[in-house]
UniProtKB/Swiss-Prot annotation:
The gene is EME1A. Its EC number is 3.1.22.-. Interacts with MUS81 to form a DNA structure-specific endonuclease with substrate preference for branched DNA structures with a 5'-end at the branch nick. Typical substrates include 3'-flap structures, D-loops, replication forks, nicked Holliday junctions and also intact Holliday junctions with a reduced efficiency. May be required in mitosis for the processing of stalled or collapsed replication fork intermediates. Plays a role in DNA repair and in genotoxic stress-induced homologous recombination (HR) in somatic cells. This is Crossover junction endonuclease EME1A. SMART domains: ERCC4. Transmembrane segments: none annotated. One of its GO terms (cellular component) is nucleus. InterPro entries: EME1/EME2_C, ERCC4_domain, Mms4/EME1/EME2, XPF_nuclease_EME1_plant/arthr. PANTHER family: CROSSOVER JUNCTION ENDONUCLEASE MMS4 (PTHR21077:SF5), EME1 PROTEIN (PTHR21077).
Length: 546
């Protein structure tokens, strides 16, 4: 069994160390304590075995107890009795409590040269029967070249250091906890009575405002629904809307050959009209007597943004010959901004042909009449202006019928729900009635979008939807910057199209390019044929040009 080595400093003498059976054959041991151990030569006559104690701890079978076996003999004798039969290594040190001249040298510096000399704790040689002799502890002498003052350990100083370290750790934990606390968890100041009453009043006011806002929003929703219902009633009842429209006819219109037929046609349809002097001669404008709530919902209120200009053939030819047509357009625009304009002529072509025939048959007696650039002037109205149209009627009856039909259409358009591209076609799909996959297209919005692209057949749309089930999945590839534009244009060309009869074909390059350029076009007003030819790739949208 291993020996028991006790190292202690100021231990209680009443508590005995743990007992352990002593070895009978104990070998004398020299214990060298050194921070930098160095092998030393052993005297030839010595039988003791030196052991060097480095900074590493001792093994488990050796127990070192630090003890202050002072100079007093009483303490040493008590220790001898306690450790009788035990192998104990004792490191002596001066007791801190014992007064003496040595205590004045307690805090003197230790020189480095003195540490290089080894400290030795030697046990004298013992006989075989020395196990029962307690005097072996007395023979233990601590031979060291260092003075006791130099190697003395200040236990109080160590306690102070450990106390400071503990306090520092506690402060770190407290600061970390305080920083982790949020602003909400910090203790709040106690509110006074006035502050509490103010906070309660503010909460009450806030709740009342929220209630008022909810009530106002509900009232607005109810009014909006009521207005929509009234509009639907007006849209369904055509006669009701027709009775509310009023036509304001200029005096010059009735002076023409079609004045009588026009008035009779309006009376047959029970349309209200007024003959007056309009700011623009030969014009007809319309207004509607609608309820205030419906009139306020319209962009121009009770006014209808449309103006009709009626000309006889001779008057229109003179207007073009004098180059006053374009000036007339600007004058009407100044008077009726944002209005749609229409030039209506009566017997224009027949009048021109008649004049040309007379001039051709009798050039000598002719007045030298030449055809004015009517075609060029009408073409300019369509190409150079937005919202400017022209209409040529054969006779007076057609003029009167056109005015009556136009009046009824304007009356219904004001209260009718606005049409969109998808609402123009039945069920919002552009496909033939005999399409085999009609039910699939009606159930899928993505298929409706693909079919709405011109020249994209339903079977091509279905092939694309199988590979890319949504618009987002296709646009994700189209928006990938790592793929070139050429690859994106021909992305869909190899998709298989299932045919009921014959071989399966592919979508093709033309359809793939059309789908890409239509979906990725920067200008929504451009035509699809132009987009297919790459027009959108070289032009900027109107918003960027301003």
């Amino acid at each position: 069994m291993s020996d028991f080595i006790l190292i202690s400093d100021g231990e209680d003498e009443a508590t005995p160390p743990p007992s352990k059976r002593a070895r009978k054959n104990r070998t004398p041991t020299d214990l060298n304590l050194d921070t930098e151990p160095s092998l030393q030569k052993q005297p030839p006559g010595s039988a003791s075995t030196p052991f060097f104690l480095d900074e590493t701890p001792l093994s488990d079978d050796v127990t070192v107890l630090k003890s202050s076996f002072g100079s007093g003999t009483g303490a040493s004798s008590g220790r001898e009795n306690n450790f009788f039969g035990k192998r104990v290594i004792s490191l002596e040190s001066d007791s801190e409590d014992s007064p003496g001249p040595e205590s004045s040298k307690k805090y003197e510096p230790v020189y480095t040269d003195s540490w290089k000399k080894p400290c030795r704790l030697e046990f004298g040689s013992s006989d075989a029967n020395s196990d029962d002799d307690p005097s072996w502890m007395r023979r233990a002498s601590f031979q060291s070249s260092l003075s006791k003052d130099a190697i003395e350990v200040d236990s109080d100083h160590e306690k102070e250091d450990t106390g400071v370290e503990k306090m520092g750790r506690k402060k770190q934990t407290i600061t970390s906890k305080s920083t982790s606390l949020s602003a909400d968890s910090l203790p709040k100041k106690k509110m006074s009575k006035d502050e509490k009453t103010r906070a309660a009043e503010e909460k009450k006011l806030q709740k009342e405002q929220e209630k008022l806002q909810k009530a106002a929003s509900k009232a607005e929703d109810a009014e909006h629904k009521k207005l929509e219902r009234e509009k639907q009633k007006w849209a369904k009842e055509k006669d009701k809307a027709l009775k509310c429209i009023v036509a304001w006819i200029d005096n010059k219109v009735l002076e023409g050959s079609f004045g009588g037929l026009l008035i009779s046609g309006l009376k047959e349809k029970c349309i209200t009209y007024h003959v007056t002097t309009n700011p623009i001669q030969r014009s007809i404008v319309w207004t509607m007597t609608l309820p205030e709530d419906i009139a306020q919902s319209l962009p121009l209120g009770s006014k209808i943004p449309y103006v009709l200009l009626l000309y006889e053939a001779e008057d229109f030819c003179n207007l073009v010959a004098k180059k006053e047509l374009l000036e007339n357009v600007y004058r009407v625009r100044d008077e009726y901004p944002s209005y749609t304009m229409c030039y209506l002529t009566n017997k224009l072509l027949s009048y021109v042909n008649k004049k040309e025939r007379v001039e051709y048959k009798d050039p000598v007696n002719g007045c030298g009449w030449r055809k004015p650039p009517i075609d060029e002037a009408i073409a300019k109205l369509s190409t150079h202006y937005i919202g400017v149209h022209s209409r040529h009627c054969v006779d007076e009856a057609e003029v009167a019928d056109h005015v009556v039909r136009l009046t009824s259409s304007l009356a219904h358009c004001q209260v009718r729900k606005k049409l969109t591209r998808l609402s123009v076609y039945a069920d919002g799909t552009l496909m033939s009635k005999n399409a085999a996959d009609k039910h699939l297209i009606r159930e899928s919005i993505w298929l409706k979008v693909l079919v709405a692209i011109p020249k994209v057949q339903p079977r091509y749309a279905i092939a694309v939807s199988k590979k890319y089930p949504s618009l987002k999945s296709l646009l994700k590839v189209y928006m990938d910057p790592n793929i070139s534009v050429h690859e994106k244009e021909f992305l869909l060309k190899d998709l298989k199209v299932e045919n009921l009869v014959g071989r399966d074909t592919s979508v093709g390059e033309a359809c793939s390019k059309r789908i890409y350029r239509v979906l990725m076009s920067l200008d929504g007003t451009i035509k699809t044929d132009d987009v297919e030819n790459g027009a959108a790739s070289f032009t900027l949208p109107p918003s960027d040009l301003i």
